[in-house]
Every structure is written in structure tokens, then in C-alpha cells.
Amino acid sequence: MKQIKVAIVGGGKAGTAVLEAFFKDDGFSVTCVVDVMGDNCLAAKTVLKGKGVRVFSAIKEALTVADNIDYFVDFSTAEAVYENTQTYIGAKKAFIMCASGLDVKQKQEIEKRCLAEKIKGAIIPNASTLAVLGMYFDKIAAPFTRDIIISETHDVTKADAPSGTAYNTLVECARAKGHNNFEEKDFKLSGTSVKNSQFIRHVSSGIEVHARRPQTEGVTTQFVELYSEAQRLTIEHVAYNRQCYKKGIELAIVYLEKNGGFLQGLEAAMGLV
């Protein structure tokens, strides 16, 4: 595969970690970074020093060097993801969306537009390959279980609770058990919504998610307990730092370069479907 030129959108913790990983891989080059804070973003103050990589404060500014960008890799905020995808599609630029915040209808609309306009794209809110494998195994095991409890831990700076990965694990396990109702009224919550609750329970399937936000940084975990009569299966994923996302992004790009089209999640790129 030719060297891939990327633009990183979001120069915070995740974007900075992935930047560092890209700098170590000769198969990729970083054209620019986009962050609303410009030169004051974390990436600009740390890993970009001495690299000669330009920092823009808006995607439209980065499009001035679009000929040197093969893929936009987006780690922006949930509030920005939909608008950002519209900008990429409007500019006919390939993208890997790694931020959460899109609902089902928006994902379907984005995929439909990309396929119609032959724009390569992917929506992978969790780019950690082993986290995706964990969810895959959870889904396989779910029909054989009575109770499922999902526990996830992120540091206190994470904006949403539960995480998108934990919520998606609940949805996939519930579907595997024959449940397809996922409106707000179908959950018992400790907070104001399914995106702002440290405890949620899917009423019909009984699957629970417990979210923890300790005053620490670094390690994130998801711990899934699957119970049946007199037995328990535990599937745990631990991410030691955010550089774990780089492998998933690489797999998505390799898949799209070979096959074109659009990816919803990493499963196809990992050969799981």
C-alpha cells in the first residue's frame, strides 16, 4: 500500500496519542492537525514540536491543502461529528470518524451519501481492535446466558457515561437475545438520559451497564460478566493508553483502499463478518 497522508481532527488526548503512533509508522505521513484551539491544543504543545506539521483551527482551513490529504481521521467532540462528516462529504474527501455522537439515522444517511458519491468512509467510535473482539465474543455468548452485567471505567474527563462501547455492547447482546427495543423509555436510568447515566438497565433483556469515572487518568476497562445456571463467563478488555486506536484506524484504511465502500464499525475490516 502507498504511503497514506492523514489529517488528524481533534488535537486532544486521543488525537495526540494516535499522532504519536502515526509518527512511528513509515506507512503514514501526517499532513496537518485540526483543532479549534489551534496552536494551543495539546498536540501542538507536545508531539508536534519540531515536526513541521501545520495546525489549523477549522476543517475548511485544512481543505486548502486537501491535495496532500488522503484521509481525515476525526477525534472531535460528539457535538461536532455530524457537521464534520458533512464537510468531508461536501469536499469529497475520505474520512475515518472515531468520535461518538451519531445516532442510527445519521449513520445510515452518511453511509448512503458516501456510497452514492463514491467517497470512502468509516464510522468506528471504538478503534481498539481488542475491544471490538471483546464485543464480538459477548454477542456470540449472549443467547446462552441468563444475566449480563457490563462494567466500564474511564477517567473523570470522559464527557459521556456510559461509554459508547458499553452501550453498544448492551445493544448487541440484547439483540442477540431477541430484543430490539432501544428507545429511552425502554431503560431504567440513574441520570437524565442513556448518554448521561452511570447506571442503565435495559428493561426487557435485563442487561445492566455500570459506568465509573474515578479521579485518575490512563487505563480504561470494560468488564462483561455473562451468567448462566451455576456458571459465569467473564470477558475483559483493558486499554493502557490511546495509542491502541491506531491499529484499528490502519485496518479500516487498508480495507477501504482495497475494497472501497463504507465501514460501520471495524468488524468487516477485521474479517469478523
Regions found by a protein language model. Give the residues of each.
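C-terminal substrate-binding/catalytic lobe of Rossmann-fold NAD(P)-dependent oxidoreductases
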Residues: 5, 9, 13-63, 146-273
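Hydrophobic beta-strand scaffold residues
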Residues: 30, 55, 95-96, 121
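N-terminal Rossmann-like NAD(P) cofactor-binding module of classical short-chain dehydrogenase/reductase
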Residues: 70-73
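ADP-ribose/adenylate-binding Rossmann-like module
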Residues: 77, 84-107
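Rossmann-fold dehydrogenase core element
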Residues: 94, 109-127, 146-151
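Rossmann-fold NAD(P)-binding glycine/threonine-rich loop
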Residues: 99-121, 132, 136-137
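Rossmann-like NAD(P)H-binding beta-loop-alpha module
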Residues: 132-145, 161
